[in-house]
């Protein structure tokens, strides 16, 4: 994920090295830098715990570790539609966190022509959009998962 070889997304896309993972939230297609995602987990039960904040869907048992699973859809003014969401597992600081999405799609390598810096629309969600990429013939928001998770930190130490 963010080892010694981590370079900013803009640098990598300028050299045809940037990859994104596409996913759906609330019927909308989005993407994020694949280097931010350790793995995608599907068909696993998220266990609800008492007294959890609304944004925390529960915890996922992953190789003996309890990983908190967060619903970021409200930050995008969307709503998760899947009964059993796919989970993008990421690390923020030293905390492993799952991000619930309706479905995870393919990993795509981008050319420089397929990436544009984020336009400002004036919406609150602008703070989470780092760019726009062309996927499946459409312009798609490139999201900063780290910034979304910093909005309301959750999780336990790794």
Predicted regions and their residues:
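An acidic, low-aromatic, low-complexity terminal/linker signal
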Residues: 1-158
């Amino acid at each position: 994920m963010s080892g010694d070889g981590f370079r900013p997304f803009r640098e990598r896309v300028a050299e045809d090295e940037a990859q994104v993972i596409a996913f759906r939230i609330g019927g909308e297609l989005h993407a994020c830098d694949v280097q931010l995602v350790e793995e995608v987990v599907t068909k696993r039960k998220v266990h609800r715990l008492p007294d959890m904040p609304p944004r925390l869907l529960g915890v996922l048992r992953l190789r003996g570790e309890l990983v908190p699973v967060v619903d970021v859809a409200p930050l995008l003014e969307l709503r998760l539609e899947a009964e059993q969401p796919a989970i993008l597992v990421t690390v923020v600081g030293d905390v492993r966190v799952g991000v619930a999405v309706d479905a995870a799609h393919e990993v795509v390598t981008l050319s420089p022509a397929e990436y544009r810096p984020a336009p400002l629309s004036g919406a609150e969600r602008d703070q989470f959009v780092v760019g726009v990429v062309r996927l499946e013939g459409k312009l798609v928001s490139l999201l900063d998962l780290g910034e979304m998770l910093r909005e309301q930190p959750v999780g336990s130490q790794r």
